[in-house]
């Protein structure tokens, strides 16, 4: 069974950077050793957003973006290697999620698309890459997401305490870790995505630092109620979503009925949408003793305060309190999934995704043995 140092690479729906994590992994432990966040250039971020909003592009443009992202991921990995004074031969493999640009797991031809050419990562790092984790699950009738609940269970499951792990990235997803029960999990709806999109359009800021702007506004209750009537929130699990659904166009359609709304009030309402839509799902599943939050949303004091207020009797805290960096959780999960793949172990949970069976996930892009020698 493969064990040793692995690198996880994650570029999520928030587009706030490429998270790269170094970890020692074997069948008994996942020990994070180092991490960094690598910036995404503005032109690449724009290209990704255009695709996710359904903007037309040529196959040449898609191919270029695929290559450019692969090179960017390689740069991020090489920066971490240099920081830690490591050589390619010191790393067993890279687990790379890629950048999701479309996710449509239902219909006659369900599909998901992550770009960032893994061949370029191998060529520019000299390290074996495991990628393309989601499509096997979709081929088996699953949603292809979320994949992190299996990792949450491995690291944070408890024999007696009823726990939930909440990842607030661009999209928020919930893992239900209940003793004696199969792990469940699904996307609850927008996390940071709509808040980030609104402040970017209004203030040219990538995100609302410390929720300072939202705190200046007041929740527009009719707007909140209108958004919460979206059918996604009432849909049964398993379910997953992404930027192709909850995007700026979705927000504009809801705002059309509220001309002249104060921009700060809209930001406050979007923060409340994130908190309320999550809290509703926590309560729908019977609540828990501890809600452990990871992802960028764990650093949003307004969302965290609202979750605590909406969920009395539940301890709401970040995973940092349990010794696992909330910022690095997803990248760490894909390092772990790479280890699972190389060990021939399944990476999905049918109880989460709805797949017909558990399966080894991903494709392996082997490094040139000469490069790794």
Swiss-Prot record:
Disulfide bridges in this chain: none
Pfam families assigned to the protein according to its UniProt record, in alphabetical order: AnmK (PF03702)
Gene Ontology molecular function terms on file: ATP binding; kinase activity; phosphotransferase activity, alcohol group as acceptor
Gene Ontology biological process terms in this record: 1,6-anhydro-N-acetyl-beta-muramic acid catabolic process; amino sugar metabolic process; peptidoglycan turnover
Enzyme class at the top of the EC tree: transferase
Residues that hold ATP according to the record: 12-19
UniProt key word Kinase: yes
Reactions mediated catalytically: 1,6-anhydro-N-acetyl-beta-muramate + ATP + H2O = N-acetyl-D-muramate 6-phosphate + ADP + H(+)
Coiled coil regions, renumbered to chain: none
Pathway(s) it belongs to: Amino-sugar metabolism; 1,6-anhydro-N-acetylmuramate degradation; Cell wall biogenesis; peptidoglycan recycling
Keywords attached to this entry: ATP-binding, Carbohydrate metabolism, Kinase, Nucleotide-binding, Transferase
InterPro entries: Anhydro_N_Ac-Mur_kinase, ATPase_NBD
Protein name: Anhydro-N-acetylmuramic acid kinase
């Amino acid at each position: 069974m493969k064990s040793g140092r692995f690198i996880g690479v994650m570029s999520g729906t928030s587009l706030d950077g490429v998270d790269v994590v170094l970890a020692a992994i074997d069948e008994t432990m996942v020990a994070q050793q180092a991490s960094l966040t690598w910036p995404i250039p503005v032109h690449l971020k724009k290209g990704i957003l255009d695709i996710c909003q359904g903007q037309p592009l040529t196959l040449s443009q898609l191919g270029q973006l695929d290559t450019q992202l692969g090179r960017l991921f390689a740069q991020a990995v090489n920066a971490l290697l240099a920081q830690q004074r490591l050589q390619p031969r010191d790393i067993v493999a890279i687990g790379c999620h890629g950048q999701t640009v479309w996710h449509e797991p239902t219909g006659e031809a369900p599909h998901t698309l992550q770009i960032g050419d893994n061949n370029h990562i191998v060529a520019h790092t000299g390290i074996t890459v495991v990628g393309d984790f989601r499509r096997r699950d979709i081929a088996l009738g699953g949603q292809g997401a979320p994949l992190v609940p299996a990792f949450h269970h491995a690291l944070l499951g408890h024999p007696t305490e009823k726990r939930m792990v909440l990842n607030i990235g661009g999209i928020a997803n919930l893992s239900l870790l209940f003793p004696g029960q199969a792990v469940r999990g699904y996307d609850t709806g927008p996390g940071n995505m709509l808040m980030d999109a609104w402040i970017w359009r209004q203030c040219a800021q990538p995100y609302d630092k410390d929720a300072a702007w939202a705190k200046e506004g007041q929740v527009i209750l009719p707007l909140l109620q209108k958004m919460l009537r979206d059918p996604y929130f009432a849909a049964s699990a398993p379910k997953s979503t992404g930027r192709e659904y909850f995007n700026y166009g979705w927000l504009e359609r809801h705002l059309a009925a509220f001309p002249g709304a104060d921009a700060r009030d809209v930001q406050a309402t979007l923060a409340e949408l994130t908190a309320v839509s999550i809290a509703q799902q926590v309560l729908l599943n019977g609540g828990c003793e501890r809600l452990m939050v990871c992802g960028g949303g764990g650093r949003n004091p307004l969302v965290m305060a609202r979750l605590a207020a909406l969920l009395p009797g539940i301890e709401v805290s970040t995973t940092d309190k349990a010794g696992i960096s909330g910022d690095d959780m997803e990248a760490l999960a894909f390092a772990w999934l790479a280890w699972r793949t190389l060990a021939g172990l399944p990476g999905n949970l049918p109880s989460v995704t709805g797949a017909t069976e558990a399966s080894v996930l991903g494709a392996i892009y082997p490094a040139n043995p000469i490069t790794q020698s």
